[in-house]
Amino acid sequence: MTSAEIRQKFIDFFKSKGHVHVPSSSLVPHNDPTLLFTNAGMNQFKDTFLGLEKREYTRAVTAQKCVRAGGKHNDLDEVGFTARHHTFFEMLGNFSFGDYFKEDALAYAWEFITSPEWLGLPKDRLWVSIYKDDEQAFDVWHNKVGVPADRIVRLGEKDNFWRMGDTGPCGPCSEIFWDMGPEYACDHPDGCRIDTCGCDRWREFWNNVFMQYNQTPEGLVPLERTGVDTGLGLERMATIMQGVWSNWDIDLWQPIFARIHELSGKKYEGEGPEAVAFRVIADHARCCTFLIADGVRFSNEGRGYVMRRILRRAVRFGRVLGFAEPFIWKVAGAVADVMGDAYPEVRERLPVIQDELRREEERFLRTLEQGMNRLEEILARMRQKGETVISGQDAFVLYDTYGFPLDIVRDVAREQGFTVDEQGYQAAMAEQRARARAARDVSYITEVQSRIAGHLEGVAPTRFVGYTELAGEGRVLAVFDQEGNATGAGEGSSVIIVLDRTPFYAEGGGQVGDTGQIVAPGLRVEVEDCRKLPSGHHLHYGTVQEGFLEVGQQVEARVDARKRKDTQKNHTATHLLHKALREVLGTHVQQAGSLVAPDRLRFDFTHTGPMTPEQIAAVEEMINAEIEAAEPVTWTEMPLDEARALGAMALFGEKYGEIVRVVSVGDGWSRELCGGCHVSNTSEVQYFKILSESGIGGGVRRIEAVTGPGVIRHLEEAQARAVEAQEQLRSRMKEMEKELEQLRAKLAASQTDSLVERAQEVGGVKVVAGTAPVATMEDLRNMTDAIRAKLGSGVVVLGAVTSEGKVNLVAAVTKDLAGRVHAGNLIREVARICGGGGGGRPDMATAGGKNPERLGEALNAVPGLVGSQLGL
């Protein structure tokens, strides 16, 4: 049976059981920051299991694309060396959202794998495991499905309690195993069993997870609705159905192996270094093909970096097969041929996929040879010294200089009998990150800038053109590392670049430095910040993403236009805020500091005491009126004395030159000395909203605010918080209601015993009459029944006052008193005293009353009324 047939049969089977076929979701999780990649079939249903999303169906079946590489679920190092590890794989799954649970889920699984109509596996080669305390699962497997008890294995939390990650839906699970046969048994001293050795004789292929909880940072929280999440690995199932030992021997891999054979001239024979290379290349080519199809691109962070590690590992293994030129992009064509019917996006996007792969291969091959030579030198030196562990520092240099991920160093070391000091590597990496962080500290920057300034003596300052341009040509005057040493820089290097001209605004006047790119043919640098030396040289802090950077290169500097525009809105809004505060609070208000960023603004000002809500509203109203008036924003340069004569506000303590830049709003409504970037008209700010006003000490207040799209984000976040608070309140109310019911039940139970103990005897008949702490007629009947049962023989009359101020009454008579005491007649007389009426059967009757103040009198009359019916 082919893999495609297994996939289709699975979908068809569960569709016959009322499941809706839901297409595979993207490998890039939607709106889930807890996941790097989609790594299980249930990822796309996470919000459904949590009760945050409601779907039109309660049963679903999927064939889901998954990747496990990076993060908690990371199989990368094992791929190629074991029979069943892959980075990309397919997970077949059936799901229940508050519909069926364990009994149906396990019965469906057994039917699919054993029925001749579907897979038809022999039952005597199947075993199951359950969570050690899951008696319900044992009962279903043994008593309902018919699995012998000695084939049901109990395992602990590590094996049979499933969690998607550190947070999210989870619960106990039950796995199904295939016995490869006694000829594959190991020699474990306690015997070869699932619960002793877990060796490759036992092939787990289907996991049934019973979603009962949500794992939060605080602990397990029961889900409102239980659910079922199952995962059947397609590759493992195909291994069983096709009668082969290894996942690599199934039909999905053979066309890909054939393509590698065609390109390399080598043959896949299952064992040895070349076989490992075949498997690594095939797996990693398939994984990268699907990731690129789903929009992931190679980069130095996040998903893109993990994909880069995967591809570079494959390229390195390509050397084992003799590849010296890009080749994985050609293997991707075979992947599309094999997988394109099930996943058409791979075939449709193949040109883009191959182009991305080819360019990334070319980029890495430029440094691979040098890096491998350096690694061989390290290994040769170690052999001479009799050492077996590659130092963490050496491994880090291979990464930092040649772009070798730790995976590659580890693989080469393993092949030649060496290991890697991974702790030392991580320490070197942490040290570099600490240096990068320190490079942002003022004290460190002063030292670094001093060193850089020494190198730049006699070099003309950078010409800033960013007021009118967001992109422009420039020449590289100098390149420094994070410690201020002059250098050239290759891919992955953190650098500080000085250009002869730039559109990048350097941090100053509260405005953050621009971000963007510096590019040239074969070169791309991501600029993360821009600062300025007192000498006027702009320092562009960034990371080389592609190519090699050196002095003298002609480059194009490109500012991130969206971020700059948002920053300009916030900077103009800061000027409007300053003016409005002086209008509303008084001219004593002076700017004491500010932060102008793309997503927000912060303004510190002198003022004693908090602003009132009315003052905050007045400031907002004044600013938004200026925005709506669409006033022009202009700037001009003039002598400092002239600017002061015009009334331009200056920042206290700031140093200004003889010629200053004055930014004006409208016809001088606001006029400030400012070297920052602004919109050309107040209407571009769109809207202004104050988020908070607080004191930061010493008679200085702080306002935080947003403009334009930031206001929309703020409102959306506020709405989300309100919804969340509403949900939490609703949940808490439900909990309180439940707690109240429990308290009432406890009180009722206690009252029951007390009333029975205080029963009176009338003519030899036990009589109980009293009030009950219950809210409803149903609760009152239940309590009456409980007392009647405890009495064994007798009469019970209970009363309770409702929340509406009405009286509920119940009378009950034991069967042995039938014909002597009539409950309906008795309750009618009792109710009459309370201003009501009622009646009912001889053994049980209910009534109501309007006068709760007479309930005690009515209950006191019960013994006499019972005596009357007994003829006493």
UniProtKB/Swiss-Prot annotation:
Q: Which CDD domains match?
A: AlaRS_core
Instruction: Name where it's found.
Output: Cytoplasm
Q: Where does Zn(2+) bind?
A: H571, H575, C674, H678
Gene that this sequence comes from: alaS
Which reactions does this protein catalyse?
tRNA(Ala) + L-alanine + ATP = L-alanyl-tRNA(Ala) + AMP + diphosphate
Q: Which domain of life is it from?
A: Bacteria
Keyword ATP-binding among record annotations: yes
Q: What is this protein called?
A: Alanine--tRNA ligase
